[in-house]
Structure formats: structure tokens, C-alpha cells
């Protein structure tokens, strides 16, 4: 952001994932109180596109893990921020405190390619966030589960036209 300001250019993130109709429906269900008090949100954004250590020789990939070009974060800044925004958007709460475990699973990388983050939201909700670029078998896996005192919701970006709603002591309904 500071570099962009000094350069006179705009630095912005397009949080397009919250534009999906069923993500907006999740937000309205939470705001309406359908889930009651939100107890926990589990969100992940994982993929395995950077699992190959040989990518260190690929200039199209190398910059992502170079602090001089990417800044202070790798995978979290690339994908994890979308997961955090999703949790904030759906819950209507903002991050208040967090504890993060960032790790480079490939020794040649200076920035993280995997992260676990525990977040306390300003409304009291806890968020468990995992983001990884070395999760072989995951394909652009943005998923969110919201657990409240009256029920739970589950949405996956791989199946964006389906939202699972499970009320306490009820059957799961697939909303399409």
C-alpha cells in the first residue's frame, strides 16, 4: 500500500467471491438471525498449484515468495485474505485479534505457502482459517462453514449454486 501511494497508483483487492448469490444469501440468513448467535466460522482457501519446489526457477511463480516483490506475506496475502474477508462479510463482524502460524513448506521460499490463523471477531465469533498453496488435490478450494446456536451453513466455491442449511435437530436442506 505504501509503495502504491509513493508511486501514485491504486492498490486494491477485488473481493469478488462475496458476489455469489448464495454467499449473499448466507449473509442475509446470519443477519436475520436464522442461525442464532454465531459460535464458529471455519473457512479455507487451499490449492496445490505451488506444491512443486521446482517452481523456484519459474519467474511467473518466483515473485510470489520474494519479499522484495510480494511484500511481507505470500499465501495469506494471495488467498487467505479472501477467506478472511468471506468470514467478515458473512458474519457482519470484523477481525479484532488474530494468532497466525505461517510456514514455508519448501525451504527455498522466504514467504509462507501455508498458514493457519485463529481470529477473534469484534462480535465475539471465533474464526478458524486455513490457506495453503501446497495442498495437492485441492483445486481453488474456497469453502466456508458457519455454525450458530440454531443451525449451520456450508458453501463451497467449487459448487457455488448450492448452499447447505442444517437447522439444529433438523435435516440438511440444499438451497439452490
Task: List each model region and its residues.
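C-terminal helical cap and adjacent loop that interface with cofactors, partners, or active-site loops
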Residues: 171-176
